[in-house]
């Protein structure tokens, strides 16, 4: 799918932050489309408090790749399918995740929570090795001195080859290059897994992804007409 054929999708607004329909992430020259977006929050004393807004962008080739198995499924079917989100996380296409602060957060707070989720997942599936332990140490180091005000963002560009490009933005703009590139496929996938996986921290982002991708994966009317004529 060439850039001129990028899928037509709408922006998503969460609180005051707008995720545009397409972006060019740090560390890649390709435009990505907005797969879905949602908040991450917690119920505190009976009130739902939103901490971050999360947008998940996908390379255009995600659509034909996912269509093989998921074309024609309803939003509900996709929302309830662990395998669907696993196929997004591990699929042979690039992904870009933007985590934008609604409330202020320190890099240490963020990295500790993410790595805790990653390690728990790896231990559960039996894939936690020395390489992952070293990657976790480096990940925590990258975030150690960072602070994120409301509107600040953490940016992850995930390559199917195994690299994870991490960048930061304090003003909503996207830098052209990353702050650091980490070469660990498990960590690269685990960051997105921790958001939209089986125990993902943003059910709202999962629901948005499922609804929007269900529409994008529907057969084109022309294809249906052709099939009916055969």
Swiss-Prot record:
Keyword list, A-Z: Flavonoid biosynthesis, Isomerase
Site, as annotated: Important for catalytic activity: 110
Pathway the protein acts in: Secondary metabolite biosynthesis; flavonoid biosynthesis
Annotated binding of substrate, by residue: 52, 117, 194
Domain of life, per lineage: Eukaryota
GO biological process, one term: flavonoid biosynthetic process
Entry-linked SUPFAM superfamilies: Chalcone isomerase
Gene3D superfamilies in UniProt: 1.10.890.20, 3.50.70.10
Single GO molecular function: chalcone isomerase activity
EC number(s) from the headed UniProt entry: 5.5.1.6
Top-level EC class: isomerase
Annotated catalysed reactions: a chalcone = a flavanone
A UniProt-annotated Pfam family: Chalcone
Functional note: Catalyzes the intramolecular cyclization of bicyclic chalcones into tricyclic (S)-flavanones. Responsible for the isomerization of 4,2',4',6'-tetrahydroxychalcone (also termed chalcone) into naringenin.
Record PANTHER family: CHALCONE--FLAVANONE ISOMERASE 1-RELATED, CHALCONE--FLAVONONE ISOMERASE 1-RELATED
Note: Part of the biosynthetic pathway for all classes of flavonoids, a large class of secondary plant metabolites, many of which are brightly colored.
Homology family: Belongs to the chalcone isomerase family.
Name used for this protein in its record: Chalcone--flavanone isomerase
Protein's organism: Camellia sinensis
């Amino acid at each position: 799918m060439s850039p001129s054929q990028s899928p037509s999708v709408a922006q998503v607004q969460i609180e005051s932050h707008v995720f545009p329909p397409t972006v060019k992430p740090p560390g890649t020259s390709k435009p990505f489309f907005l797969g879905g977006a949602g908040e991450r929050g917690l119920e505190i004393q009976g009130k739902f408090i939103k901490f971050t807004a999360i947008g998940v962008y996908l390379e255009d080739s995600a659509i034909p790749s996912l269509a093989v198995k998921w074309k024609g499924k309803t939003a509900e079917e996709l929302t309830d399918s662990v395998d669907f989100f696993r196929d997004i996380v591990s699929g042979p296409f690039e992904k870009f995740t933007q985590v934008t602060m609604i409330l202020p957060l320190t890099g240490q707070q963020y990295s500790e929570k993410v790595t805790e989720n990653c390690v728990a997942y790896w231990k559960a599936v039996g894939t936690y090795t020395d390489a992952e332990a070293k990657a976790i140490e480096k990940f925590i180091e990258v975030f150690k001195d960072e602070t994120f005000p409301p509107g600040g963002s953490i940016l992850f560009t995930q390559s199917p080859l195994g690299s994870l490009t991490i960048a930061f933005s304090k003003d909503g703009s996207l830098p052209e290059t990353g702050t650091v590139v980490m070469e660990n496929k498990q960590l690269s996938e685990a960051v997105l897994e921790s958001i939209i996986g089986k125990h993902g921290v943003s059910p709202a982002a999962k629901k948005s992804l499922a609804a929007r991708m269900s529409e994008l994966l529907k057969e084109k009317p022309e294809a249906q007409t052709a099939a009916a004529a055969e």
